[in-house]
Amino acid sequence: MNKTPPETRTGEIAASPARFLGRGDAAVFDTFVVPQYLALFAERLLELIVPTEDARVCHLQCRTGYPDRDLLARLPNAHVYGCDNSEFAIELARAKAKTIAGFVHDYRVIEAFTTPFPPGAFSHGITLHPLAAPAERRRMLEELARIVAPRGQALVAMPLRGSFIEIADLLRECALKNELTELTNAVEAAVQLRPTDELFKRELEEVGFEFVDVDVRTRTLRFENGRQLFEDPATRLMLLPEFRVNLHMPDDAPFAYVREAIDKYWSDGAFELTVNVGVVTGRRKSA
């Protein structure tokens, strides 16, 4: 596992290896991860955005700026402010934004969720695929509550509980066969980190939003074999780093078991990975 670079060590969330995106990674992320994986979360989020004239949108954890181009189709003339911990992702987001005629944008590098914006500055606040850890979600939702204006809209899309259950099952099998009690406990704890739809709804309500609803749609990712799964850019840049953090896994031996098991059990067909795509939306309560 790559050592976390010094520039990402400020603040607990920013220091997570699951948040790091280097220069080369940012380009791969935008070229492959966005259309093949992140689009699963953006497509429904965009449909649920409430149109507003002269919208001001804050995109927390914006990475390389997706889906800000598509956002303009839903919110013409919107001003978009994107924030992320990766300077390389922000660099690419800025370059892409300059190719869109008339697009008013401001992309900034931030630490954790500390945005420089005043309270109530935005009509909309959005986030795609935040980390599963409850502390991460809480800080992100609290920041959305701070910067979204009364009656403004927040939208957050992420994998809900039950996502990636096939990998969890194979890790459980690995733990059972090798009598790894710590791994069994780690898998069970990691599975519980992701919210259910009811918990997701309650969390947004608790920070000051009303008319909250959660849209859930099940999608599948198909892989021909274990190698394709583990070499896929979405797995490498998004899923595995977070799995390692959530499982507190000291080495990758259990993942090697998963890869071999996929090749064994699914030798005659594709391996399908479940993703429960959840989008929570709500309106900021009036003061």
Protein language model features and the residues they cover:
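N-terminal, positively charged/glycine-rich alpha-helical extensions of SAM-dependent methyltransferases
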Residues: 1-27
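Conserved alpha-helix/loop element of class I SAM-dependent methyltransferases that forms part
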Residues: 35-55, 70
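Class I SAM-dependent methyltransferase SAM/SAH-binding core
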Residues: 56-115, 139
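A short acidic, Gly/Pro-enriched loop at the edge of an enzyme's catalytic core
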Residues: 113-125
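A short SAM/SAH-binding and catalytic strip from SAM-dependent methyltransferases
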Residues: 123-138, 158
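Helix-to-beta-strand junctions that scaffold the AdoMet/dcAdoMet cofactor pocket
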Residues: 134-135, 148-150
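Conserved catalytic/acceptor-binding region of the Class I
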Residues: 138, 151-224
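C-terminal helical/coil "lid" or tail adjacent to the Rossmann-like core of SAM-dependent
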Residues: 213-268
